[in-house]
Curated annotation (Swiss-Prot):
It comes from the Bacteria. GO terms for biological process: translation. The lineage of its organism: Bacteria, Pseudomonadati, Pseudomonadota, Gammaproteobacteria, Chromatiales. Part of the 30S ribosomal subunit. Interacts with proteins S7 and S18. Binds to IF-3. Belongs to the universal ribosomal protein uS11 family. The keyword Metal-binding does not apply. This is Small ribosomal subunit protein uS11. PANTHER family: 40S RIBOSOMAL PROTEIN S14/30S RIBOSOMAL PROTEIN S11 (PTHR11759). One of its GO terms (molecular function) is structural constituent of ribosome. Keywords: Ribonucleoprotein, Ribosomal protein, RNA-binding, rRNA-binding.
């Protein structure tokens, strides 16, 4: 049987990009893109080995950000702009850990969507 030819993925060299941190109450998703918005690497708290209530901790967000950061460091990325979205507990720790990995963070922006009285929010918990 003939061997099927598969294209080897070309390693891209990108010097600066954007880190999108989506911090919900249950999970934190870190996506690192180039300037055009093409995804280079991503990681989540759940995918980093945390399950249940540990997924929503600042430490889990830190581990996810470091995991995504190491992947794009191999591509030669040095400068990052950080965009944070959501009210979750992993907001600051994920942004701080990207700085600790060795990136030069040029800008931190909060792009959390704020409704002009749109959908009804979830009811308050009675514990």
């Amino acid at each position: 049987m003939a061997k099927t030819s598969t294209k080897k993925r070309v390693k891209r060299v990108v010097s600066d990009g954007i880190a999108h941190i989506h911090a919900s109450f249950n999970n934190t998703i870190v996506t690192i893109t180039d300037r055009q918005g093409n995804t280079l690497a991503w990681a989540t708290s759940g995918g980093s080995g945390f399950r249940g209530s540990r997924k929503s901790t600042p430490f889990a967000a830190q581990v996810a950000a470091e995991k995504a950061g190491r992947i794009v460091q191999e591509m030669g990325m040095k400068n990052l702009e950080v965009r944070v979205k959501g009210p979750g507990p992993g907001r600051e720790s994920a942004a701080r850990s990207l700085n600790n990995v060795g990136f030069k963070v040029t800008n931190i922006a909060d792009i959390t969507p704020i409704p002009h009285n749109g959908c009804r929010p979830p009811k308050k918990r009675r514990v």
